[in-house]
Amino acid sequence: MQLIEKAPAKINLGLDTPYHHQDGAEEWNMVMTSVDLADYVEIQTLTKHKRIRVASDSGFLPNDQRNLAFQAAHLLQTNYGIDEGVNIRIKKNIPVAAGLGGGSSDAAAVLRGLNQLWSLGLSWQELAELGLQIDSDVPYCVYGRTAHVRGRGERITPLSKLPAAWVVLAKPKVSVSTPSILQQIQYDHLEHPDIDGLLRAIREQDIQGMCAVMGNALEPLTAHRYPEITQIKQQMMKFGADAAQMSGTGPTVFGLCSKQSRAQRVFNGMKGFCREVYLVRPLP
């Protein structure tokens, strides 16, 4: 049996980490939303053996245990005593190591897909709890849409859909290792964004209010290493974005626009600065 699961990219409208736990894991306080840039994950179950095979059309993606989609299949296979193998083929549209959650979204897609193909009957909450063993973004990616994410990534509160908005994504030519950024965190020196204010603006459908309080506590760490992030933000604002911010640990920057015509102008302008530029919309 086989099916295809859509694996949308995510952006962080707000990202804060107020402290870390004794085991070193970060405590997160984030507002995330899915956008209509997505990978497509084809999942085929195999009855002749238990091997897990991962393939993709990206030369930058590992196809072994380092791949989060592989880990998701192995986790379900091991936890539930499944005697079947899996072929996973990923059509990559989301840039790799970009701060857009592509790997986590692929893993979440495998969890959802195999839950169906193997008739496991797991709830999304149960899938999210399993996903936390893979990566802190996987629980959110199981649900998708717009959500408030707390804890180690497992506390997901769905939010109302965003007010009408368009998003321009621009990824510079660098790739960022998330662990290398997290290791640099000095909690006493972080600037904490107004997550409560962002949640209030979303509830009130106030896009200008959202733009005024958006923030990413990790942006200065990545931008210090890769100054092109700041340059991209400046260019987006120059071309007319209502707000511009780094997503995740970077390096992708997104510009939020309240009007489609303005977003198109930002998109056209940014194509002269970055090879990977996308004009997308938040998923409803």
Curated annotation (Swiss-Prot):
Annotated positions binding ATP: P95, V96, A97, A98, G99, L100, G101, G102, G103, S104, S105
Record's keyword annotation contains Transcription regulation: no
Q: Which gene encodes it?
A: ispE
Q: What is this protein called?
A: 4-diphosphocytidyl-2-C-methyl-D-erythritol kinase
Tell me the classification of the organism that encodes this protein: Bacteria, Bacillati, Bacillota, Bacilli, Lactobacillales
Q: Which family does it belong to?
A: Belongs to the GHMP kinase family. IspE subfamily.
Under Enzyme Commission nomenclature, its number is 2.7.1.148
Which InterPro entries does the protein's record reference? GHMP_kinase_C_dom, GHMP_kinase_C_sf, GHMP_kinase_N_dom, IspE, Ribosomal_Su5_D2-typ_SF, Ribsml_uS5_D2-typ_fold_subgr
Q: Which UniProt keywords apply?
A: ATP-binding, Isoprene biosynthesis, Kinase, Nucleotide-binding, Transferase
